[in-house]
């Protein structure tokens, strides 16, 4: 068995001319295709590329080669790549077909012809386009309010994809450019949520992925509602707070913590709490304190359960009159789940 050895690239022109001289005649060349400069052919990755070469001189000898060596010499295939074959729709065609094109196929290809008069060449430059693909993106992140956040989104593709960041809210801002990094300085609670990274080029539809940003912040009382109560009836005080993580609630009266007992019932869900008196008596009238706390802080609001006709306002207000030791004790208790 004879083993074929690819010649050195520097010797390819000489080898090719010698090879062409040995080839049998038969394939002509259309000289008009060989008088112009290099043609560019653009093909999407995975598609089939056809590099055209048409001849007209019946006494010519033809070969295809690229930077790696000789691909075809006449009808003799030198390349070991099964994706490569000749395309002959008619007797004068000597085109090269490359199936399932990949990025390593990109480069210059030469159709070289030895005519009766002089050698001629036609060059084709194959450009391989690649759809955008996000290769790396930040994981979901949780930070405290006021921190600096950097999100990363890296993508591959040809041409180079353009990266666009967008905050997925009704009024979310779009951050556009070729930067892979999105920096948020001093992040606020309003900037929490999902961020979308979009990588786009002209080859196909964009590749899109998301990152969730959670912003922790201390509790803020958003609503505290006092209530009018008639003796012998049921009455409730309600308190709502905004916080991440969700706050824990406690109720106090006269610096004494209240538990669900003796006709009092406390119900707390995420972000809100209520204190219900099942059967109001004279001793239940007065000031109550709702305390909301999470690992970042504690706040409180003062509410009033008042008699019918009292001149006291209906809406409670945030109060700083509660002793600091009580707030500190409440926070420690909530954090330790006492």
From Swiss-Prot:
Glycans are attached at residues 40, 66, 136, 148, 279, 287, 300, 315. Residues 1-28 form the signal peptide. Expressed on limbic neurons and fiber tracts as well as in single layers of the superior colliculus, spinal cord and cerebellum. One of its GO terms (biological process) is cell adhesion. SMART domains: IG (SM00409), IGc2 (SM00408). Keywords: Cell adhesion, Cell membrane, Disulfide bond, Glycoprotein, GPI-anchor, Immunoglobulin domain, Lipoprotein, Membrane, Phosphoprotein, Repeat, Signal. GO terms for cellular component: cytosol; extracellular region; plasma membrane; side of membrane. Pfam families: I-set (PF07679), Ig_3 (PF13927). A lipid is attached at residue 315 (GPI-anchor amidated asparagine). Disulfide bonds join 53-111, 153-197, 239-290. The keyword Cell membrane applies. InterPro entries: Ig-like_dom, Ig-like_dom_sf, Ig-like_fold, Ig_I-set, Ig_sub, Ig_sub2, IgLON_domain. It is found in: Cell membrane. It is a lipid-anchor; GPI-anchor. Residues 29-122, 132-214, 219-304 form the Ig-like C2-type domain. The modification Phosphotyrosine is found at residue 94. PROSITE patterns: IG_LIKE. Its main location: membrane. Residues 316-338 form a propeptide. Belongs to the immunoglobulin superfamily. IgLON family. Mediates selective neuronal growth and axon targeting. Contributes to the guidance of developing axons and remodeling of mature circuits in the limbic system. Essential for normal growth of the hippocampal mossy fiber projection. This is Limbic system-associated membrane protein.
